[in-house]
Regions:
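N-terminal lobe of the biotin/lipoate ligase/transferase fold
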Residues: 2-167, 187, 196, 239
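Short loop/edge segments at beta-strand edges and connector loops
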Residues: 88, 175-177
Length: 326
C-alpha cells in the first residue's frame, strides 16, 4: 500500500494519533510521518492538533475501497461491472480509462480516484478535485452504435445520475443542458462523455462523473460558479462515497443498456421533468457568437431547442446560460 494511503487509513477513524504512532504506521520514523502528513495538508486535508495528543483529521474521511463498492452493488450491476480500480491520485480517471480501453479493458470497467490533478469539465475547464472529499468516477462502455447516434448519451447518463441522487434524499435537483446537475442554481454534479471509434461503430465511450460530496470551503476558491455538495443537502447525514459510487453504477448501467437499445427517446419525458432551462430566456455561447432566445426542451438527438427571433433553432453544442435580468 502507498505510504500516504497507509497514513490515511490510520487517520481515517477521526481519533488523535501521535507523531510516533503515525511514523510507526508507516514503518518509519516520526520525521517521515510528519513529511507525509505535510503532503496530505498540501493535498487539501485539514487537521486538528491536540497538545499532547497528536493529530487527527478535522473530520473523519471514508476512503474509497473497491471491495466495499463491489459488495454494495445490486446483483445485476455486480455481474456486469468489470474491474474497479481505485487510486490515491491520478491526473484524470477518464484519461486512465481511455488508456486502458486501448489495452482491451472490458466494458463496464470503473476507475475512481481520491484526487485528480487534471480533472476537467466541458470546454477543458478544470474540475476542482480536492483530496478524499468528493466522488470522481469514470466508467468505460463499449457500444455497437455509430458515433453519430451517441450524441444524446450524456443526457441519458444525467437521468441515471438523477436517479442515483434520489436515493440520498436529493429530490430537488434539476438538469441543465447538457450535463450539469443543479440545486437552486448551484452545481452539485457534472458529466463528461468522450466517444472514440468508427463512424458506423463500434465505439468506446468513457463517462466521467464528478459529484461534490463534502467540498472543503478552502478548496472551492477556484470554482467560478455557485456550488453545493451532498453533505450540505443531506443535513446531519454524512454521505458514504462508497455507497454513492455503487448506487451510481446501479442506476447508470441500465440507462446505458436502454440507450443502446432505444436511444434517448425512452428518457425524453423524464428529462423534461428535470429540465431547468425549459421556458427560460437563455444565451447560447458559440465560438463566434452568442444567440439568445427561449429554451424549448430537447429533441431525440439531445440537441437543445431554442425559439429565437429568427425562428426555432437546435443546438448540438454550445454553452447555455440563463439570461441575466436587467
Amino acid at each position: 500500500m502507498h505510504l500516504r494511503n497507509r497514513l490515511l487509513h490510520c487517520l481515517s477513524n477521526g481519533e488523535f494519533h501521535s507523531g510516533e504512532a503515525l511514523g510507526a504506521s508507516l514503518g518509519r520514523s516520526r520525521m517521515a510521518g510528519g513529511k507525509h502528513l505535510k503532503g496530505l495538508r498540501e493535498a487539501g486535508l485539514e487537521f486538528e492538533v491536540g497538545r499532547g495528543k497528536g493529530y487527527r483529521l478535522a473530520r473523519p474521511r471514508e476512503l474509497l475501497d473497491a471491495e466495499r463498492i463491489r459488495s454494495a452493488l445490486g446483483s445485476e450491476a455486480r455481474e456486469a461491472v468489470g474491474d474497479i480500480d481505485v487510486f490515491l491520485e491520478l491526473d484524470s480517471t477518464s484519461n486512465w480509462l481511455r488508456e486502458r480501453a486501448q489495452q482491451d479493458a472490458v466494458s463496464a470497467s470503473v476507475c475512481l480516484a481520491e484526487m485528480q490533478h487534471g480533472g476537467r469539465g466541458r470546454h477543458g475547464r478544470q474540475w476542482v478535485s480536492p483530496f478524499a472529499a468528493n466522488l470522481y468516477l469514470s466508467l468505460l462502455w463499449r457500444s455497437d452504435q455509430a458515433a453519430a447516434s451517441l450524441g444524446g448519451l450524456s443526457l441519458a447518463a444525467g437521468i441515471g445520475l438523477m436517479r442515483c441522487l434520489r436515493h440520498f434524499g436529493v429530490g430537488q435537483a434539476g438538469l441543465k443542458w447538457p450535463n450539469d446537475v443543479l440545486v437552486d442554481g448551484a452545481k452539485l454534479a457534472g458529466i463528461l462523455v468522450d466517444v472514440t471509434g468508427e463512424l458506423s461503430g463500434p465505439c468506446t465511450v468513457v463517462i466521467g462523473v464528478g459529484i461534490n460530496v463534502d467540498m472543503p470551503p478552502g478548496a472551492a476558491t477556484g470554482i467560478e460558479q455557485a456550488w453545493t455538495d451532498m453533505n450540505s443537502l443531506a443535513g446531519s447525514m454524512d454521505v458514504s462515497r462508497n455507497r454513492l459510487a455503487a448506487t451510481l453504477l446501479d442506476e447508470l448501467l441500465p440507462v446505458l443498456q436502454a440507450f443502446d437499445a432505444g436511444g434517448l427517446q425512452p428518457f425524453m419525458q423524464e428529462w423534461q421533468q428535470h429540465d431547468v432551462l425549459a421556458g427560460q430566456q437563455v444565451d447560447i455561447s458559440l465560438p463566434d457568437r452568442t444567440i439568445s432566445g427561449r429554451a424549448c426542451g430537447i429533441d431525440a438527438t439531445g440537441a437543445l431547442l431554442v425559439e429565437t427571433a429568427a425562428g426555432r433553432k437546435r443546438f448540438g453544442a454550445g454553452e447555455a446560460s440563463l439570461r441575466s435580468r436587467s
